[in-house]
Amino acid sequence: MAHIDPLAREDLAELEPGFELVEQIMGFVPNSMLTMARVPGLLPAFQGLGAVVLANPIIARDLAQMVAMMSSVGSGCRYCQAHTGHTAERMGVSPEKLEAIWTFETSEHFSEAERAALRIAFHSSQQPNAATSTDFDAAREYYSDDEIAAIVAVCSFFGYLNRWNDTMATTLED
């Protein structure tokens, strides 16, 4: 049971354009966004940041979604794990890869470049932060500093979502 109930979408007509965009990407409007709508200005700001972080041309969208999922795995947020897995599949990540994400370090489904990105995602989402210079050195073998910054941006964006949803005990949609 959620600590704070989400608002009804039909009562948020001014936010409908943003809801429609999210619905195109995810297939539904998350309860987390309907709860964020309780704070004036928060949801549009959050959606703006999300658009920059998740739809930038610096890293591929499927990689961004795998990074988001691994960040949520590292933080332990089940709500975000469900959403990122669902969205990753919609972005073209294979079901085999999604099932193997828990063992990305050894799975044949992941390239060394993907492992480097997922390692940063997993380590940076732990408390205390476990990302090391070794993680960044490994990532630099495959990614530019701009690409690494984009990977960390995804981790940070989902750090907010992981904290929000775990704290609010956001209820997963049907």
Model regions: which residues?
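Hydrophobic alpha-helical segments
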Residues: M1-D174
